[in-house]
Amino acid sequence: MTDLTLIFISLSGNTLSFVRRLSQYLAEKHHIQTKTINIKELHHETFPVMESFVAILPTYLEGGNGIDSGKVEILTNPLGDFIAAHDNVKHCLGIIGSGNKNFNHQYCLTAKQYAKRFGFPMLGDFELRGTNADIERLAQVIVARLTADQQS
């Protein structure tokens, strides 16, 4: 059995719902046990993470369109601080973004910014709470990434 940590921040409950369902799916279908860390519950505390993890980040940005304005992250910054602290970034397999497609260019923009900032891949995205198809699709991506990481 393989272990994986999912590090995320959930403000409205959508990301938490997705993480719970993804964890259950990974356990049942791929025999991967997950440990979850909701950064919101840490109250800006950081600590070293020594195992491989996937970051999951909802999109909260200042107003705007994501092109000319509205590119500045709000509310979810503690996840970036956690990844940057203690060289945790070296254990991150990649990031999954979530958002609302009604926001067009801002959809999952924060996750794309993290991928560029930290140099890890954007593994995928889902809208709002995600669908069962999103769970299956992203689980496959995670399994492939975890397998590649373990073989290197």
Curated annotation (Swiss-Prot):
Organism from which the protein derives: Streptococcus pyogenes serotype M18 (strain MGAS8232)
NCBIfam families: PRK02551.1
Family, similarity comment: Belongs to the NrdI family.
Ranges that cross the membrane: none
Coiled-coil stretches noted in the UniProt entry, renumbered to this chain: none
Listed GO MF terms: FMN binding
GO BP terms: protein modification process
InterPro entries per record: Flavoprotein-like_sf, RNR_NrdI
UniProt-recorded name of the protein: Putative NrdI-like protein
Pfam families for this protein: Flavodoxin_NdrI (PF07972)
Superkingdom field: Bacteria
